[in-house]
Swiss-Prot record:
This is Pupal cuticle protein PCP52. Residues 166-195 are annotated as: Disordered. GO terms for molecular function: structural constituent of cuticle. It comes from Galleria mellonella (Greater wax moth). Keywords: Cuticle, Signal. Residues 179-189 have a biased composition (Polar residues). Component of the cuticle of the pupa of Galleria mellonella.
Length: 353
């Protein structure tokens, strides 16, 4: 390149006129250039390598710049995706806990409502009990004996005595062992005798109270009424020991020879055989489960009662039904159910209004 420039400069210098154009012509002399400057191939190759390196550096810098921009874009996109995922996860957790909170609030409200209902039922338990059964459950001692004495006891004032059966110690329930049954029967007989004596005293007191109530509400009783009351008292006194010992007598009947026919020879039957017992008054309300035939049955005599085995009404606590002649007097408070699965002792209780 330098050689070309230098050659052009020399040509221009030699071509320029140094005198007038149409003057004397002088011979042109061209000086001889001994050494023309030249460029070595190494310099040219070095320049080419230098240019190539510069181009490669520029291309590498551009590629690095593009790579950085691409990585930054990818990083920004990843950050946005992570941020969006975190936001969605946070919203999902908020929705979940909001649902759980709503569920617990509903459960708390339900428990509060149940507690209020239970409290209301507990505070109105007496009213609910009276609404279910508004009366006193009177269980006669002897089946199908309906007398004015027991009716008077049930229809007395709020402080009236009420007959209720209390459980005595259980006898032996193993019927497969005869010896153990006999031992338990003898023990039950002694306890039943004591219970029967106490029952007779309580029954006499109840009869006296009922008789006084009847005398205060009605006119003077006639001789027939007094005979009926006396007959009922003696029949109950004779029936209580037999009723409490009926189970033991049935178990040991084959050994002792005692039967219902032998009871008919008792001297108690003689003065009471002609005195029928008074039927149940029409004001009594029978419980559900009591057969109508038992209510409408004809009055029995003391002799027929003594000649037949004495039975007691039973109460099934699981099924809530009553069998036997059990009646309710309206207007009085109900008493608790009575279980007659074991030998029992009727006691005299008072139930306030």
């Amino acid at each position: 390149m330098r050689v070309l420039i230098l050659s052009a400069f020399i040509a221009c210098a030699t071509a320029a006129p140094s005198a007038p154009v149409f003057g004397t012509l002088t011979p042109l002399t061209v000086p001889y250039i001994a050494n023309i400057p030249t460029i070595s191939p190494g310099d040219i190759q070095a320049a080419a390598i230098d240019a190539k390196v510069k181009v490669e550096d520029a291309l590498r810098a551009a590629a690095d710049r593009n790579q950085e921009l691409l990585e930054q874009a990818i990083e920004n996109q990843n950050e946005k995706v992570i941020e969006v995922n975190d936001l969605l996860k946070e919203k999902s957790q908020e929705a979940f806990w909001s649902t759980e909170d709503t569920k617990w609030q509903a459960l708390t409200a339900l428990q509060t409502a149940e507690a209020k209902i239970d409290g209301t039922l507990a505070s109105n338990a007496d009213l609910l009990g009276k609404a279910v059964l508004n009366g006193v459950v009177v269980s006669p001692v002897v089946s199908r004996i309906y007398s004015n004495v027991i009716q008077g006891v049930a229809a007395a004032d709020c402080e009236t005595p009420v007959l209720k059966a209390a459980e005595a110690p259980e006898g032996n329930k193993d019927e497969g062992n005869k010896d153990s049954v006999q031992v338990e029967s003898s023990a039950t007989e002694s306890e039943s005798d004591k219970a029967a004596a106490g029952f007779v005293r309580n029954l006499e007191a109840a009869q006296a109270a009922a008789q006084a109530q009847l005398l205060s509400e009605t006119s003077a009783p006639t001789a027939d009424t007094r005979a009926v009351i006396a007959a009922s008292s003696e029949a109950s006194a004779a029936a209580a020991p037999a009723a409490s010992l009926s189970e033991a007598s049935a178990q040991s009947a084959s050994e002792t020879g005692v039967s219902a026919a032998s009871l008919s020879q008792s001297p108690v039957a003689t003065p009471l055989s002609a005195a029928p017992l008074a039927p149940l008054p029409s004001s009594s309300v029978p419980l559900a489960g009591v057969p109508a035939s038992a209510i409408a049955a004809a009055p029995l005599t003391a002799a027929s009662l003594i000649a037949s085995p004495l039975t007691l009404p039973t109460l099934n606590l699981e099924q809530q039904w009553v069998t036997g002649p059990v009646f309710v007097q309206p207007g009085l408070k109900a008493i608790s159910p009575i279980s007659l699965q074991t030998p029992f002792v009727p006691t005299l209780l008072k139930t306030p209004c």
